[in-house]
């Protein structure tokens, strides 16, 4: 399952690489949903479907449903930055703190007991997300993402599994680009 804004590209990759799986992409933004549907038709993947779904509204049909969840919640808190006047951009980049809590809570509820969720977000939101996750029996592994070696983390990757109690782990940072702006060995290995 791909719960995110602009769900099409990641859902396509997961469906292509896992042809025997069922892949569902949730998308709230109607324009992004239409683009995802066009890409789906173009690539003719039978194991993929998209659903218009606000990720902040719980759908009981999907409780304990997914083995794998990939999610990219909006990165910016709506009340802390200047927002775009384009409504398509607003739904994909900005979120309230209360809606982000709902989004993350739904990920936990949708995840099977032995499932895994991966969430990417801004590094500066890490403490906010961890504080929310501490209310659940989860193992949360945090991996800072650096654009280049020796740069400050811009984003973070959270790996979430259900547990008997809350466990927090931190892994070494993943460096995205090498000195020539190519993908680093970290990224090449991670995508394998």
Identify the function of each model-found stretch.
Residues 152-192:
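SAM/dcSAM-binding transferase cores
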Residues 1-5:
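Conserved small/polar residues in nucleotide/adenosyl-binding loops
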Residues 36-37:
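Conserved SAM-binding loop
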Residues 96-153, 157-158:
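Conserved Class I SAM-dependent methyltransferase catalytic core
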Residues 22-27:
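Conserved SAM-binding motif I beta-strand of class I
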Residues 58-69, 77:
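A short acidic, Gly/Pro-enriched loop at the edge of an enzyme's catalytic core
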Residues 73-102:
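Mobile active-site "lid"/loop adjacent to the S-adenosyl-L-methionine
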Residues 7-20:
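Conserved SAM-binding loop of SAM-dependent methyltransferases across substrates and taxa
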């Amino acid at each position: 399952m791909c719960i995110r804004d602009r769900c099409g590209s990641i859902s396509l990759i997961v469906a292509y690489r896992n042809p025997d799986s069922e892949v569902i992409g949730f998308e709230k933004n109607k324009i992004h949903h239409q683009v995802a549907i066009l890409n789906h038709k173009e690539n003719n993947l039978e194991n993929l479907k998209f659903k218009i779904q606000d990720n902040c509204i719980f759908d009981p049909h999907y409780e304990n449903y997914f083995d794998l969840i990939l999610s990219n919640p909006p990165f910016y808190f709506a009340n802390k930055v200047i927002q775009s006047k384009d409504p398509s951009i607003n739904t994909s980049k900005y979120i309230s703190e209360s809606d982000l809590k709902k989004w993350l809570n739904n990920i936990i509820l949708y995840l099977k007991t032995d499932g895994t969720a991966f969430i990417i977000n801004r590094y500066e939101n890490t403490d906010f997300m961890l504080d929310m996750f501490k209310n659940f029996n989860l193992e949360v592994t945090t991996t800072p993402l650096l654009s280049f070696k020796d740069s400050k983390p811009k984003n973070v990757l959270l790996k979430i599994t259900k547990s008997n109690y809350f466990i927090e782990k931190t892994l070494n940072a993943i460096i995205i680009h090498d000195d020539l702006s190519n993908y680093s060995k970290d990224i090449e290995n991670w995508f394998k």
